Amino acid sequence: MMLRNSCVFALVFFLTIKILTIDTRSISENTIESILNNPTNDTHRKLLHAFTGYRHRFEQSPNFKALRWNARNLKIEGLCELCDIGAPLVRLLLELKETALINEAVSLFCKEYKSLDENVCLGAAHEYMGVVFQVVELAPLTNKQLCALAFDCQPQTDFPVFSWNVTFPNKPKPTPRPPQPPSSGSPILNVLHLSDIHVDFAYKPGSQADCSQPLCCRQGQPAPGHAGAGFWGDYRNCDIPYWTAEATLKYAAEIEKVDFIYYTGDLPAHNVWNQSRADQLYSINTINNMLAKIFPNKTIYSAVGNHEAAPCNLYPTPNIKTDNISWLYEVLADNWIRFGL
């Protein structure tokens, strides 16, 4: 237990508190040496040797002061420096099967790093950490390549691995045909295109609309001198309530003759740090039921957006067996068949 606590202390120190407030020299050299020279557990000694090897890098890095400032202000330069330092440490911990240490360090980071809402930070970590671990373990990429891919720390053109070679069929291109506008009196179709509705079923009129989270208008009282969330919606950090989406679509159905509908996804709200599969399916089924009621006998050509998945943006390919996306595809298929596809 004491060795584990030492490992947690070292990881938290180098990845979290140091970035925020504390100088590395505040830890006694004797403390580090006593841990390193303990022969009880070679694995933990290897781990701590790696950690202490980063001490000099932290103290001597010419960009470290900029990192501390930029991290507080969520600048991409700070994220890149943090990624450059953290990626090899994370890989080492994964190799040693010490993911619990990363979890503990991230939890402390979320509690101490005041520039991020703690609930958003912890929720996002819970949603995405397992995926990050899997990508880091499976991706045949260097640390620099990972940081370039995640945060655009370097142009991806710097790395040949990101330059895909797409071979086209060895056939001549067809001769372009000039556009042929329809003749006067040709039949006309009216198409309704719905996209990015982002309905928030937790929307609360009068609540705080400029909160510390990416999505507001859900709870809390507005600050003195600030207006609360409007009944029909708000232009601040808020999605629309269900009744606004319903009224808008009813209005469209009443004043327009719609022949068919393009429906290109992104129904759920933007609370991506605490969404579950059940939340996403509730949003999808509820909005689809509303569409079927308001536009009966209309064919709806649908697509899926990045926000339908849980976690958001993640659509695992079929070769990922541990966390497949069939739970979403099956529900979408049922709904799309109902829409006439």
Provide a role label for each language-model segment.
Residues 3-6, 18-189, 194, 206, ...:
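Non-catalytic terminal accessory segments
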Residues 1-13:
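Classical eukaryotic N-terminal signal peptides for Sec-dependent ER targeting/secretion
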Residues 15-20, 306-309:
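Membrane-embedded alpha-helices of multi-pass membrane proteins, especially ion channels
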Residues 80-83, 87, 99, 103, ...:
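Generic preference for well-ordered alpha-helical elements
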Residues 69-73, 157-281:
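N-terminal active-site segment of His-dependent metallophosphoesterases
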Residues 89, 149, 153, 197-200, ...:
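Structured segments of extracytoplasmic/periplasmic soluble domains
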Residues 94-97, 117, 157-161, 204-205, ...:
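Short, flexible/disordered secondary-structure transition segments
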Residues 171-183, 280-341:
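Extended active-site neighborhood of metal-dependent phosphoesterases/phosphodiesterases
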